[in-house]
Each structure stands twice: as structure tokens, then as C-alpha cells.
Amino acid sequence: MAPPSAPLPAQGPGKARPSRKRGRRPRALKFVDVAVYFSPEEWGCLRPAQRALYRDVMRETYGHLGALGCAGPKPALISWLERNTDDWEPAALDPQEYPRGLTVQRKSRTRKKNGEKEVFPPKEAPRKGKRGRRPSKPRLIPRQTSGGPICPDCGCTFPDHQALESHKCAQNLKKPYPCPDCGRRFSYPSLLVSHRRAHSGECPYVCDQCGKRFSQRKNLSQHQVIHTGEKPYHCPDCGRCFRRSRSLANHRTTHTGEKPHQCPSCGRRFAYPSLLAIHQRTHTGEKPYTCLECNRRFRQRTALVIHQRIHTGEKPYPCPDCERRFSSSSRLVSHRRVHSGERPYACEHCEARFSQRSTLLQHQLLHTGEKPYPCPDCGRAFRRSGSLAIHRSTHTEEKLHACDDCGRRFAYPSLLASHRRVHSGERPYACDLCSKRFAQWSHLAQHQLLHTGEKPFPCLECGRCFRQRWSLAVHKCSPKAPNCSPRSAIGGSSQRGNAH
């Protein structure tokens, strides 16, 4: 049996539709004015969860129109959605965007297959030059071309800016409800109400296990999986399980390696339009997510969530090997390499290996000689931002933060706090492997090199590696290493060589 097609106006053969006259009173809102339609290609790109959401929203919209007395006869689209089938049918076509003969022709072909008589013969589209209804153009599916402008809402790429503007106009017609705070548009009032909670901070959905609150019900459902430990989404390639379907979709790109979406600014490629849209914020400088506690802004929502745990003190990721807890899963993964001894990041210039990528990047500056942090006051450059911050305190005449015990003054509260541990004897940084404690984090980092065996400071002349910077400087000035020039020493090693 053929699926129902979009309703057609009843009129006699050969009669032209009466032309619309200007100045008429606006007609009542119909379901076809607010409904969203899909072509076969677009329907095939939707995931099962997206199709279920589409069914719910369309039914809710039709119910709202019925309450207002504007529903009219049941559309073929609603009848198709009520059958809960995943197969695309012509009822999903927009009757205002496709020629009338297209839908009727498909219906007649389907009836021919079933052995029925052809009730509605297909009509030919009116030719150019004759009066009558002009056949509308078929819907264009945005191509994922590289190098063209990208829609910030859906992530689709277009060949030129004119096509992008046409796409935006069509989206505005389908999304008539704008947010007064940020201007983002939505198709239905319920979606707008849910979105506005992001601005107001309202969180009406509460977890009955831990009391955490959420602005949307689906976020609460995703959170509750953490308590149950359930991971219902399995990868068919490697068997790995995930809590969210989106995480599984992102993981499967590691097997296929497909990255069809290219950044027009730097050429980097991504597997999904959403990842490309997030990446492009590094070029535009956009940071749409703001912390309500300290007004700090972030490019990604996940970065904001991790940052907010600094204010709440929440650390939901415990280490199974020790008692330490972490605010993000990435920090837990990085910490567990201390127990396993894994060092997956290797230097391409020497044989040094590192457990963290940030440590590798800092180490590679030793080979390149790059110092990306210059002092704006004197021009002196540094390899680390922390070293620059400490150096800039030497230019500051006002040192407002004084030590109560010895009267020494400091330019920053962090330097004063680190200094006061000398008087109090406090050692808040403990080694995970031997429980030895230190007053400063840098001292703990140097100590942990004894356990890992890591030697991040290589001599560029002879290739010998050292655990500490000053050990390399002493080696440069040693008479036993005549080929190692003191000028290439790290930090102030050249000055030490001249002193000797």
C-alpha cells in the first residue's frame, strides 16, 4: 500500500488556481507553515534518537495547533509519523517546495505496482511562456565542500556566501522563535524555553542520587548513567562500550579515519561539523560560555563544566590505584601513567619520552631554542608563562603583598603564599609513590623524575640527558666536556661558565 502523500487542493482539470491578491487579510496558521520536512537523503542522515525527537516535536506542534483550532484535517505527515516506521515515505516531502506532479506521479507508480488502477494521472509541469503555476525548484541539500563559508548553526558548508545567506533565510522561516538574549532561533516554543535556561541558570531537574541539578531532562538521564554504570552503546568494530550515542559516533571515526569537514582557515580536517564549528572559534576568538562565578569565558561547554568544579570542589573521577580524585577524566588518565610508568609521547629529536603531551612540548623548546613568552617591559623572552610571570614582578615597583613574619614583600599573592610555607613548614604537595611531601609543586615535579627515570634536559652537543636544568648547566661548564659549549646551556648556564 502506498504511503499517503501531501494533501492536494481539489480543482477541476484545466482550471488555473486563482492568483493571490495583495492587501488580503492574513490567513490562519496551518500545520504546513510550521512543519519541518525531509528529503530521502536528509532522512537517511538522521540517527534513531534524532528521528524519535522529530516525531515527538511534530506531534506536539500538531497538538498545539489543535488546541488553537488551526489543526484542520490530519496531514499525511502526522499519519506517517504515528506509524513509527523508519522507512522514508513521500509524506515527508514539503508540498510547497516540490512540484505537485512529483508526489502524484510517485503515488500512481506505487499503485501500479500493487495492481491498482491509475486514479490520478501525472500532470505535466507548465512549460515556460504559458500561464499557470511555475514548478518550484527541488530542495537543495548543502554540500560539504571544502573552503566555503560555514553555517554557524548547523555546520553545513556552502560554495559561496550567497548560498549561505539563502540557507539562513530558509532557516529563519523554519525557526520563527528567536532568543532575546543571544539571537539563536528555534522551531518551537518548547525548545526556546529549554534553551533560555542556559542564560537564566535555572535547573529544575534534580538527581535523586547526588542532588546535582540540570536544566534539561535529557542531561539528567545521561548523568544518571554514571551512578548505574550502564554503557548501552557498543562499538561493533572493537566492542568498546560508551554511555552516550554521540561518544560512540565520535569513537567510530577512529576506525574509518574519515574526516570530510575541512577548516577554510588552516586546512585542518574533522569528522563532524560540530567539531569543525568548535575549532573555528580558535580563529574567530569567540568564547560563548561564561562562568557565572568569575566571569571567565570558554570556547567549549565541556571546558566550562570542568572549570566550574574549581568553585564547587567536585572531583568525580577517583584513581583506583591511590586515593586521589580529579575533576576531569583526562587528568585522571594522565595521572594513572604515574602508576603504570607509561610514557607515550616521544621526542623526535632525542630518545626522551614523556607521560604528558604538555611536558613534551616544553621539552621540544630546548631543541628549537624558541622562547614564546617575551617580557613587554624589557624584551627578555622565556620558555614558560610561569617564568615570565615571576620575572615581571622584578619590574613592578609596588609590592603590595608583605609577609607578616619577615616583612618581605611580593608582587603577587601566589608568590607570598609560596613564601609563607617557609615559615609555617606546610608541605601540601605529596608524592603518590613514596609519600614524601614538598612545599612547592615544582619541587614535587623534580622529585617524581626519580621514580619515572625521566631526564628532560638533553645536551645538544653530546646527547647526554639530565633530570635538572642546573645539572645540565654544570655539565656544559665541565672541563670533561670540552666540545659542549657553555653558550648553549639552559637558563643562566653561560653566566656560570664565565664565573668559572
From Swiss-Prot:
Signal peptide: none annotated. One of its GO terms (biological process) is regulation of transcription by RNA polymerase II. The keyword Signal does not apply. Its main location: nucleus. SUPFAM superfamilies: beta-beta-alpha zinc fingers, KRAB domain (Kruppel-associated box). Gene3D superfamilies: 6.10.140.140, Classic Zinc Finger (3.30.160.60). Pfam families: KRAB, zf-C2H2. A zinc finger (C2H2-type) spans 149-171, 177-199, 205-227, 233-255, 261-283, 289-311, 317-339, 345-367, 373-395, 401-423, 429-451, 457-477. It comes from the Eukaryota. PROSITE patterns: KRAB, ZINC_FINGER_C2H2_1, ZINC_FINGER_C2H2_2. Coiled coil: none annotated. Residues 29-100 form the KRAB domain. GO terms for molecular function: DNA-binding transcription factor activity, RNA polymerase II-specific; RNA polymerase II cis-regulatory region sequence-specific DNA binding; zinc ion binding. Residues 1-25, 90-146 are annotated as: Disordered. Residues 128-137 have a biased composition (Basic residues). The keyword Nucleus applies. GO terms for cellular component: nucleus. Keywords: DNA-binding, Isopeptide bond, Metal-binding, Nucleus, Repeat, Transcription, Transcription regulation, Ubl conjugation, Zinc, Zinc-finger. It is found in: Nucleus. There is a cross-link at K455 (Glycyl lysine isopeptide (Lys-Gly) (interchain with G-Cter in SUMO2)). Belongs to the krueppel C2H2-type zinc-finger protein family. PANTHER family: ZINC FINGER PROTEIN, ZINC FINGER PROTEIN 771. This is Zinc finger protein 689. The lineage of its organism: Eukaryota, Metazoa, Chordata, Craniata, Vertebrata.
